[in-house]
């Protein structure tokens, strides 16, 4: 029994020694990895420019800030010019990254643009807060945006002209919205604005208006329809 106990202790000590050695190696490896990462951060320098979708502004700014925090010698500049403008800037070589809220067209891919999906966003249909209507069908939305329905009374609201607000041609949000409703190139807009924020501000201040915005930037200045 004594011998057995001694063997058990010896085995235990050996196991502990081996575990300690492995822990030391792991700690050393971790320290080396940390040092290597730190050196890489210090060595990386320069600037990155990106331009494009206004609906990606919050995401792009957050990514830029996080990247610059990790790599303090790198400057990331972001401009929000619209999806198509961002892709055009990428293809012309004036920016490093083009942010788009629409899929790349075949011609853009053929010219060298490579698509990387980084997030999925929704589109909210919004109206002026004083509008009594709470929901619309997809068919009703299509009829409003193509000019077939022009008065809120036709969709169970108070009688008032419907003011149709949207994004400018080339906007990724506009492209996605019109594609979902199958109304591409058929819409009649009272105002075509160059950013998601501008659409939301216009709808908030214009009685009887309707528009669409990125779900990511939706706030209580407008009413989202169900």
Predicted feature locations:
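Exported/periplasmic ABC-transporter solute-binding proteins
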Residues: 2-226
């Amino acid at each position: 029994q004594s011998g057995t106990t001694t063997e058990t202790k010896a085995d235990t000590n050996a196991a502990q020694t081996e575990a300690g050695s492995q822990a030391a190696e792991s700690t050393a490896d971790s320290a080396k990895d940390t040092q290597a990462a730190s050196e890489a951060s210090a060595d990386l320098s320069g600037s990155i420019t990106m331009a494009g979708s206004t609906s990606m502004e919050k995401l792009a700014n957050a990514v830029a800030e996080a990247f610059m925090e990790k790599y303090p010698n790198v400057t990331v500049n972001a401009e929000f010019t619209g999806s198509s403008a961002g892709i055009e800037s990428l293809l012309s070589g004036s920016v490093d990254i083009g942010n788009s809220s629409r899929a790349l067209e075949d011609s853009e891919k053929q010219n060298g643009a490579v698509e990387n999906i980084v997030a999925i966003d929704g589109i909210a249909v919004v109206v002026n807060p004083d509008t009594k209507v709470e929901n619309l069908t997809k068919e009703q939305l299509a009829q409003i945006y193509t000019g077939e329905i022009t008065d809120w009374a036709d969709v169970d609201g108070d009688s008032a002209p419907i003011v149709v607000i949207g994004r400018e041609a080339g906007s990724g949000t506009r492209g996605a919205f019109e594609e979902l409703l199958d109304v591409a190139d058929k819409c009649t807009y009272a105002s075509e604005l160059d950013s998601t924020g501008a659409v939301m501000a216009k709808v908030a201040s214009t009685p009887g208006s309707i528009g669409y915005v990125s779900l990511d930037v939706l706030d209580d200045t407008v009413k989202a329809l169900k």
